């Protein structure tokens, strides 16, 4: 899903009038993939349905949401994105329990069919309300994206921080329940509670960081997340000798690391241009037309943009020639890349279990290397903060 953002963005920019229907198309693809996966007979078929097609459908459904929020919100854009991204954690609070109960009662096949039907029934009507601020005009062709920013020192530092954070971010969500069961003897409910606490905390964290990103520089917000995740990992998980400490770590990690992606709004602002213009113009208007619309009496009205700006066909939120949604897409790809390479590393550390019986506290439980790896990658996510201090971004 992370890696399909680029083609989804290109298609939505090429056919802006059809972009509004992308959420419905994507939702249908996602639900169809779930429905078909109920009849999967092997792992390969599961990867194709719940992996490939589910991810493609998710990207198609998700991209217009990112695009339109950028158009609808200006002053509180970070808070708007934070509230939207908090929905991921909110869904993770009750959904795992519901699916687990369905699996116990009805089995895998029936559960997948039920969930596919219920998901489409609930979300399809809501997709109608996902729309641009002003209906776009048809465009004949898509101008080339300005990708020069990819080679800028500023973007490279932000992307490096983002990818390093992603490499270790998913490890606690996978191994904390295993650690709780194998080391502390936790029951199934306590294991599930770890994930629930993380998801609930990430809801609060995303909204909080979204509020901060509208008021402070993005590197400051990144450092808040970095410090919380790093200290929480080394001090709380590293010293977790009972379940209450594990629960405290899950809350701390959800508040800090779980909200890291909300800082992308600030990165979009920094890379695409700090001077934010009016969002009251449709994404396909250019030159004088955009100026006529943007020059109204609204509070968010701004000056007309130059007719030659390639961005005039993309968004009305930024004055530079860089599409901020392209910045988002590449950051998402970096996070996806970090997630992919995290798996092999964590598997090796989990099976080798170094320092077991040799180090103190949780570091000697066999999970010490996972704890250190998670903490180091969390610390590495603050590279962009250091880069700004020395004038690199």
Regions found by a protein language model. Name each.
Residues 76, 83-134, 165:
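Helix-loop-helix hairpin linking two adjacent transmembrane segments in secondary transporters
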Residues 51, 58-73, 80-81, 259-289, ...:
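Intracellular juxtamembrane helix-capping segments at the cytosolic ends
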Residues 152-223, 260-265, 339-351:
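Extracytoplasmic gate region of multi-pass secondary transporters
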Residues 30-37, 43-64, 68, 163-164, ...:
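Hydrophobic core of transmembrane alpha-helices in multi-pass small-molecule transporters
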Residues 2-19, 205-218, 236, 350:
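Helix-to-loop junctions at the C-terminal end of transmembrane segments
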Residues 16, 39-41, 73-74, 185, ...:
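Helix-breaking motifs and short loop linkers at transmembrane-helix boundaries and internal kinks
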Residues 28-41, 227-241:
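C-terminal ends and interior cores of transmembrane alpha-helices
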Residues 13-27, 214-227, 242:
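Cytoplasmic membrane-interface "Motif A"-like loop-to-helix N-cap segments
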